[in-house]
């Protein structure tokens, strides 16, 4: 950018309006996140879920509000190029001592991209690259606190850490829980290492709230070694607080931040500091995913796309059609060297799909608003993104021209995708089952049924439950990822197939009963799910009841009664009540 900061009053006023718009957004966002502590203390799980859902819309509301202001007060869509360059420079100046500069830059981009033509989507007019460093931004309270076990010993230090969170609900037996923490840590380490002179426990200032759990996240620094840890705090059966477990493996802590789970509620003045700390204990977790899981989805998208552009500059493979059975609604492609898939809504759907583009987009938004309980892959939604045309395989280009011609345009050497979704790439479950051993088939089918159960009690009916619509993660977890037919459980009518009036009708292969658009007959699932003898054997062993209306009706009733189920992002054998049987079990409502 060759422009210099000038005294253009319009540019200054627009920059000021943009900063005001962002600050209002983050003030509302942070206020909602801060209330998670109150919901946890009160055990108001429904309010917690509602807050996570409502928070998804905050960003777009403030962007639209700011766009309207700029258009009404400044005729922003008719400003000359020099003024827009001045706007960016004045905006940068306003961020020098800002606590969330990276988020503000993304907000600037979101507003600018709604006003400017996409030919302006470069670093002269928007933030294609960050302008303000997020290193060493000071905050009060600080991002993390440090505790020194030399002062009173490790046990007393752990107590001080927990008590500093100042939850307005007493612990059931904190001495017992600290004893469990010490025993679990010793079992993990094998023996206590010698305490070095720099030994300290660093703990993020805010707890991480999700569902019915508050997580304390930190690390022990001892000499040259770092030991990450996470404490899960829940309500006990007595109504008081208990420590449910301690997670000590970095990969298990990473699972907490899986995009298949609901976003955390965290009170952060300097979110970049939280991300930097989390990266120190999960170095393989992309920053884009960490921002997303902290509820900052637009920042996650910004960082993801910057990472993608950088990857494209340093690779030469081509985008290809994703392996697996082709979908009726989505055209899916991938870049083999990058662990994601790109999903475009087709212009014409398969004959069995009675829906339109708006319905599909609404279903994908629904996924962001619900508790995904570790069983639905999150998506990143993009519009008007330019990718190198030369990187698209000819077969994929032909598919795009045939199935989704309105979804893209070619502009010089770029292919511009008008609207698409991105998800983490997984092995389709149907492909996994084809290649799996008998034991692996049994494990995958067991996981598949568990995924359906957990979605159902979280008020999600998958709709199309074919194996191809589920994927297997690198940890062997089965996750649903095809959302065009999902519905709320409470909207469905689960029925038993009525008896045929006479035998000939039953043998005809034609249905003898009427069905409304929301009617579901679980007995029919076996017809399209259990063709393989290996799959049928495993399914009937673990999930026979999924073929009966009673399971679905009971799950439906639980949702209607306001029951909020317990979902644990760690195995039962890590819970203190299982590791140390004398420990009381945390409440399961």
Swiss-Prot record:
<keyword id="KW-0816">Tricarboxylic acid cycle</keyword>
<feature type="binding site">
    <location>
        <position position="343"/>
    </location>
    <ligand>
        <name>ATP</name>
    </ligand>
</feature>
<protein>
    <recommendedName>
        <fullName>Isocitrate dehydrogenase kinase/phosphatase</fullName>
        <ecNumber>2.7.11.5</ecNumber>
        <ecNumber>3.1.3.-</ecNumber>
    </recommendedName>
</protein>
<dbReference type="GO" id="GO:0008772">
    <property type="term" value="F:[isocitrate dehydrogenase (NADP+)] kinase activity"/>
</dbReference>
<keyword id="KW-0808">Transferase</keyword>
<comment type="similarity">
    <text>Belongs to the AceK family.</text>
</comment>
<keyword id="KW-0378">Hydrolase</keyword>
<keyword id="KW-0067">ATP-binding</keyword>
<dbReference type="GO" id="GO:0005524">
    <property type="term" value="F:ATP binding"/>
</dbReference>
<dbReference type="GO" id="GO:0006099">
    <property type="term" value="P:tricarboxylic acid cycle"/>
</dbReference>
<feature type="binding site">
    <location>
        <begin position="322"/>
        <end position="328"/>
    </location>
    <ligand>
        <name>ATP</name>
    </ligand>
</feature>
<dbReference type="InterPro" id="IPR046855">
    <property type="entry name" value="AceK_kinase"/>
</dbReference>
<keyword id="KW-0963">Cytoplasm</keyword>
<dbReference type="Pfam" id="PF20423">
    <property type="entry name" value="AceK_regulatory"/>
</dbReference>
<dbReference type="InterPro" id="IPR046854">
    <property type="entry name" value="AceK_regulatory"/>
</dbReference>
<comment type="function">
    <text>Bifunctional enzyme which can phosphorylate or dephosphorylate isocitrate dehydrogenase (IDH) on a specific serine residue. This is a regulatory mechanism which enables bacteria to bypass the Krebs cycle via the glyoxylate shunt in response to the source of carbon. When bacteria are grown on glucose, IDH is fully active and unphosphorylated, but when grown on acetate or ethanol, the activity of IDH declines drastically concomitant with its phosphorylation.</text>
</comment>
<dbReference type="GO" id="GO:0006097">
    <property type="term" value="P:glyoxylate cycle"/>
</dbReference>
<keyword id="KW-0904">Protein phosphatase</keyword>
<keyword id="KW-0547">Nucleotide-binding</keyword>
<dbReference type="GO" id="GO:0004721">
    <property type="term" value="F:phosphoprotein phosphatase activity"/>
</dbReference>
<dbReference type="Pfam" id="PF06315">
    <property type="entry name" value="AceK_kinase"/>
</dbReference>
<dbReference type="GO" id="GO:0016208">
    <property type="term" value="F:AMP binding"/>
</dbReference>
<dbReference type="GO" id="GO:0004674">
    <property type="term" value="F:protein serine/threonine kinase activity"/>
</dbReference>
<dbReference type="InterPro" id="IPR010452">
    <property type="entry name" value="Isocitrate_DH_AceK"/>
</dbReference>
<feature type="active site">
    <location>
        <position position="378"/>
    </location>
</feature>
<dbReference type="GO" id="GO:0005737">
    <property type="term" value="C:cytoplasm"/>
</dbReference>
<keyword id="KW-0723">Serine/threonine-protein kinase</keyword>
<keyword id="KW-0418">Kinase</keyword>
<dbReference type="GO" id="GO:0006006">
    <property type="term" value="P:glucose metabolic process"/>
</dbReference>
<keyword id="KW-0329">Glyoxylate bypass</keyword>
């Amino acid at each position: 950018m060759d422009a210099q900061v000038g005294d253009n009053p319009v540019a200054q006023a627009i920059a000021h309006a943009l900063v005001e718009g962002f600050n209002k957004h983050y003030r509302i966002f942070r206020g909602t996140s801060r209330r998670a502590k109150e919901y946890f203390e009160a055990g108001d799980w429904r309010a917690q879920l509602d807050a996570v859902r409502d928070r998804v819309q905050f960003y777009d509301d403030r962007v639209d509000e700011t766009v309207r202001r700029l258009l009404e007060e400044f005729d922003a869509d008719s400003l000359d190029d020099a003024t827009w360059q001045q706007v960016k420079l004045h905006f940068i100046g306003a961020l020098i001592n800002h606590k969330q500069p990276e988020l503000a830059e993304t907000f600037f981009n979101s507003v600018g991209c709604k006003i400017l033509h996409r030919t302006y989507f470069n670093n002269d007019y928007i933030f294609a690259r960050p302008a303000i460093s997020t290193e060493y931004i000071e905050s009060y309270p600080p991002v993390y606190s440090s505790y020194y076990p030399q002062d009173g010993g490790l046990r007393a230090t752990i107590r001080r850490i927990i008590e500093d969170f100042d939850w307005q609900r007493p612990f059931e037996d904190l001495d017992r829980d600290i004893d469990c923490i010490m025993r679990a840590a010793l079992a993990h380490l094998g023996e206590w290492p010698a305490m070095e002179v720099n030994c300290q426990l660093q703990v993020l200032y805010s707890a991480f709230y999700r569902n019915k759990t508050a997580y304390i996240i930190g690390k022990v620094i001892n000499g040259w070694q770092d030991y990450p840890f996470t404490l899960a705090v829940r309500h006990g059966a007595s109504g008081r607080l208990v420590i449910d477990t301690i997670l000590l493996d970095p990969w298990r802590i990473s699972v907490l931040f899986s995009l298949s789970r609901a976003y955390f509620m965290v009170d952060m003045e300097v979110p970049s500091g939280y991300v930097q700390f989390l990266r120190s204990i999960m170095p393989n977790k992309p920053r884009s995913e960490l921002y997303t899981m902290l509820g900052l989805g637009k920042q996650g998208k910004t960082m993801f796309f910057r990472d993608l552009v950088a990857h494209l500059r340093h690779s030469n493979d081509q985008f290809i059609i994703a392996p697996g059975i082709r979908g009726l609604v989505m055209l899916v492609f991938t870049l083999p060297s990058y662990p994601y898939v790109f999903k475009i809504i087709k212009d014409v759907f398969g004959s069995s799909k009675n829906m339109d583009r708006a319905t599909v987009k609404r279903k994908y938004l629904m996924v962001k608003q619900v508790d995904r309980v570790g069983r639905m892959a999150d998506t990143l939604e993009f519009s008007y993104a330019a990718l190198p045309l030369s990187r698209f395989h000819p077969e994929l280009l032909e598919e795009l021209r045939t199935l989704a011609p309105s979804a893209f345009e070619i502009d010089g050497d770029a292919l511009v995708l008008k609207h698409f979704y991105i998800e983490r790439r997984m092995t389709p479950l149907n492909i996994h089952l084809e290649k799996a051993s008998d034991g692996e088939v049994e494990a995958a089918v067991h996981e598949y049924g568990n995924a359906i159960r957990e979605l159902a009690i979280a008020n999600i009916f998958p709709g199309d439950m074919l194996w191809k619509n589920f994927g297997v993660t690198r940890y062997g977890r089965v996750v649903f990822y095809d959302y065009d037919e999902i519905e709320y459980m409470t909207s469905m009518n689960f029925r038993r197939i009525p008896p045929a009036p006479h035998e000939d009708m039953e043998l005809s292969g034609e249905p003898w009963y009427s069905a409304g658009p929301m009617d579901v007959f679980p007995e029919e699932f076996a017809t399209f799910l259990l063709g393989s003898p290996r799959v049928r054997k495993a399914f009937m062993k673990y999930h026979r009841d999924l073929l009966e209306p009673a399971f679905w009706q009971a799950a439906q009733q639980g949702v209607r009664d306001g029951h909020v189920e317990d979902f644990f992002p760690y195995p039962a054998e890590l819970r203190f009540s299982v590791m140390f049987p004398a420990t009381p079990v945390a409440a399961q409502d």
